[in-house]
């Protein structure tokens, strides 16, 4: 009797790479999205650190008045920022090889565009990696859906808004004070505080914080005691235990009596869906608001003051907001134009004689 033994062909290098990339046994899951995420985020992070420390001033307004943003050029952690790409570049794709020299690339703010584009690609891949890992583990996909809210917000301020305004110089600077400067200028030019989508975003963020604090405090206050009074209550929990760690009936009864019965969830699953959905939907609306205001579909304005029967102005809060917006706009790019855009756009009165 003859036995035929087949030699098992060794798996190709590509096959082993595919198995390693998609293995859920790795300490950190990589996935196919991770193949793109890792180099893009490493590039964005490396260039950000180097530029924040040592980048030379950038001609952000395109008027040959460079603005310094790095630590070595006089800034500190609060005032430092990666200055957006120059208005002279506009929306042009501006990699290093498009500039005549590295000095020119730095002067025109090339690092900002490099960081932003790599960062957005990286966080989008991170979101895809969340979905990919959930899929391979047999989980539902809602973690990636929740993460889409900050991804949408980042895309709105770093990409959609510059596209709508016609230049990457209008993007948000990458720094603490630069972020606040962006917010102030955005209010001056678009009246974002009077935009309903921004209001929904505020409700989402602050409401989410409130609900998170309420949920955490209710759970912590209704733990099922498994320890003595001399031990921490946290020691009564063992990772993976099947038993409930808190009494949802007690928490439901407390909150129902504190407010009213139907203000309290009696279903843990619907409760946690609500905790996730509220801030996510709010931030989605904020990102949508930024994206619409990018194309100058601005917040409500009340430029026509209320007047009485004699034609005298009755001052309202709207008048104060309008004056504040004009003041902020005057301070913005003060050397690029002499008047706020709202005033400069008004047709000059005709004169006779």
From Swiss-Prot:
The keyword Plastid applies. Its main location: plastid. GO terms for cellular component: chloroplast thylakoid membrane; photosystem II. The record marks 161 as: Tyrosine radical intermediate. Fe cation binds at residues 215, 272. The record marks 344-345 as: Cleavage. It comes from the Eukaryota. Chlorophyll a ChlzD1 binds at residue 118. Keywords: Acetylation, Calcium, Chlorophyll, Chloroplast, Chromophore, Electron transport, Herbicide resistance, Iron, Magnesium, Manganese, Membrane, Metal-binding, Oxidoreductase, Phosphoprotein, Photosynthesis, Photosystem II, Plastid, Thylakoid, Transmembrane, Transmembrane helix, Transport. GO terms for molecular function: chlorophyll binding; electron transporter, transferring electrons within the cyclic electron transport pathway of photosynthesis activity; iron ion binding; oxidoreductase activity, acting on diphenols and related substances as donors, oxygen as acceptor; oxygen evolving activity. GO terms for biological process: photosynthetic electron transport in photosystem II; response to herbicide. [CaMn4O5] cluster binds at residues 170, 189, 332-333, 342, 344. The record marks 190 as: Stabilizes free radical intermediate. It catalyses: 2 a plastoquinone + 4 hnu + 2 H2O = 2 a plastoquinol + O2. Pheophytin a binds at residue 126. Residues 345-353 form a propeptide. It is an enzyme of class 1 (oxidoreductase). Its EC number is 1.10.3.9. The D1/D2 heterodimer binds P680, chlorophylls that are the primary electron donor of PSII, and subsequent electron acceptors. It shares a non-heme iron and each subunit binds pheophytin, quinone, additional chlorophylls, carotenoids and lipids. D1 provides most of the ligands for the Mn4-Ca-O5 cluster of the oxygen-evolving complex (OEC). There is also a Cl(-1) ion associated with D1 and D2, which is required for oxygen evolution. The PSII complex binds additional chlorophylls, carotenoids and specific lipids. Photosystem II (PSII) is a light-driven water:plastoquinone oxidoreductase that uses light energy to abstract electrons from H(2)O, generating O(2) and a proton gradient subsequently used for ATP formation. It consists of a core antenna complex that captures photons, and an electron transfer chain that converts photonic excitation into a charge separation. The D1/D2 (PsbA/PsbD) reaction center heterodimer binds P680, the primary electron donor of PSII as well as several subsequent electron acceptors. Belongs to the reaction center PufL/M/PsbA/D family. PSII is composed of 1 copy each of membrane proteins PsbA, PsbB, PsbC, PsbD, PsbE, PsbF, PsbH, PsbI, PsbJ, PsbK, PsbL, PsbM, PsbT, PsbX, PsbY, PsbZ, Psb30/Ycf12, at least 3 peripheral proteins of the oxygen-evolving complex and a large number of cofactors. It forms dimeric complexes. This is Photosystem II protein D1. It comes from Ipomoea purpurea. The lineage of its organism: Eukaryota, Viridiplantae, Streptophyta, Embryophyta, Tracheophyta.
């Amino acid at each position: 009797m003859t036995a035929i033994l087949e030699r098992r062909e060794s798996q190709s290098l590509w096959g082993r790479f595919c198995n390693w990339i998609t293995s859920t046994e790795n300490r950190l899951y990589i996935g196919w999205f991770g193949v793109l995420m890792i180099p893009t985020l490493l590039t964005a992070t490396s260039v950000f650190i180097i530029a924040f420390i040592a980048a030379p001033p950038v001609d952000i307004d395109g008027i040959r008045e460079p603005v310094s943003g790095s630590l070595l050029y006089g800034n500190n952690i609060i005032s430092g920022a990666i200055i957006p790409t120059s208005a002279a570049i506009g929306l042009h794709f501006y990699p290093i090889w498009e500039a005549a020299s590295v000095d020119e690339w730095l002067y025109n703010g090339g690092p900002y565009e490099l960081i932003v584009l790599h960062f957005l690609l990286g966080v989008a891949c991170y979101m895809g990696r969340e979905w990919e890992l959930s899929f391979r583990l047999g989980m539902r996909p809602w973690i990636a859906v929740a993460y889409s809210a900050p991804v949408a917000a980042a895309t709105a301020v770093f990409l959609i808004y510059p596209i709508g305004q016609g230049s990457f110089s209008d993007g948000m600077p990458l720094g603490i004070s630069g972020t606040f400067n962006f917010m102030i200028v955005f209010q001056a030019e678009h009246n974002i505080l009077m935009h309903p989508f921004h209001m929904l975003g505020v409700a989402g963020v602050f409401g989410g914080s409130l609900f998170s604090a309420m949920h955490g405090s209710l759970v912590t206050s209704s733990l099922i005691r498994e320890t003595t009074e001399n031990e921490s209550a946290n020691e009564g929990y063992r990772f993976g235990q099947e038993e409930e760690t808190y009494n949802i009936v007690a928490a439901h009864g407390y909150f129902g009596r504190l407010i009213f019965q139907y203000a309290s969830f009696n279903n843990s699953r619907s409760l946690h869906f609500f905790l996730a959905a509220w801030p996510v939907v709010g931030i989605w609306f904020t990102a949508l608001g930024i994206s619409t205001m990018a194309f100058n579909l601005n917040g409500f304005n009340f430029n026509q003051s209320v007047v009485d029967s004699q034609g005298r102005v009755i001052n309202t809060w709207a008048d104060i907001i309008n004056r504040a917006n004009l003041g902020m706009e005057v301070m913005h790019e003060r050397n690029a134009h002499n008047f706020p855009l709202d005033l400069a756009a008004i047709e000059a009165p005709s004169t006779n004689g």
